[in-house]
Amino acid sequence: MAREKDLAVAFRSTVVAPGLIVELAKRLDSLSCLSHVFVPEGSQGGFTSIDICSACLAISKRLRIGSGIIRILEHDPGLLARRLLTLQQLSDNRFVLGIGTGRAGSDPKLTIRAMLDRLRLTRESFETFTEALPGVEMPETFIRTLRKGIAKAVIGHSDGILLNFCSPEHVRDVISSLGDARRRLIVSCYLKIFYSKDEATANRMLIEEFAGYDQNPSYHKMFESVGIAQEIGRANLFLRSGKSVRPSENLKRISLANPTKRELASYVTMFREAGVDLPCLYPYFEPSEDAVFKIGKVEEIARM
């Protein structure tokens, strides 16, 4: 279970190169306020999260490090269980399994049931392997969710839920739907922060992220519920016309661009007060930004 002031960070390998993620895990391992590192897997293929996590676990001693998320329906449960077994044995049970459905398809409920069934089969295979290996534990498991229905469906199947790119109000709404079961779940949430040496570039990246998520019906509905859907559309139109755009206060309740230390601390506190147990700072950079800049910003947010 997450401690009261635990903090996580997330690194996507298309934003922070795998070798640099490993270097950051080594640097951050000594920071007691940081408990978890998540490595989200790209939706378009490329580097695999579990392999990057394996390298990070090998050079660290304390941090819990894991996928955040993998699409478990793409994995054979027996083979995945063996990989988890190996990681847990080698890392003293520090691997974290973050999973999701990927594209929900035409029947989201059916896809969610398939995901939970795949997790069950993986766990059963894992437990079969560990009968002769006392002390090796099934990884702490997080399931990515956005809507209340998914959050309620995963109760009893995971240690926590992982929310993404949402407002504190939405977090409260999801948590309130869980009732008494909320006490059995760690609630984590990705808090995306966009950094650049150029302020306009950081703002542009943030608006583009909002515009991209707004194309997803589930996120569009969530944006509508907190009154920012039209605002996102207007900001994106301004951006596409070549005009510079600064994020409004409403958008900054969900994501930040080049925040000051005070702004970042206030942002994290806002989500903790909404009920998030494990805020997960998720820095984004332009591909052209140098490694020194990225390392400096990551160390800055991890020490906030």
Residue ranges and their predicted role:
Residues A2, A25-L31, C53-R64, L84-F95, ...:
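Acidic (Asp/Glu)-rich catalytic clusters
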Residues K5-S13, S35-V39, R64-G68, F95-I99, ...:
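Hydrophobic faces of well-ordered beta-strands that scaffold small-molecule active sites
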Residues S35-I59, R71, R103-L110, F165-P168, ...:
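Glycine-rich, proline-tolerant flexible connector loops at the mouths of alpha/beta enzymes
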Residues K5-L20, G68-G78, E137-T145, I193-S196, ...:
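Active-site mouth loops of central-metabolism enzymes
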Residues M1-S60:
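N-terminal beta1-alpha1-beta2 module of alpha/beta enzyme domains
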Residues V15-D29, L80-L84, T145-A153, T201, ...:
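Short, acidic/polar
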Residues I112-A132, E137, R172, S176-A274:
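An alpha-helical appendage that flanks or caps ligand/catalytic pockets
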Residues A2-V16, E74-V136, F165-S177, T201-Y219:
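Flexible, glycine-rich active-site loops centered on histidine and acidic residues
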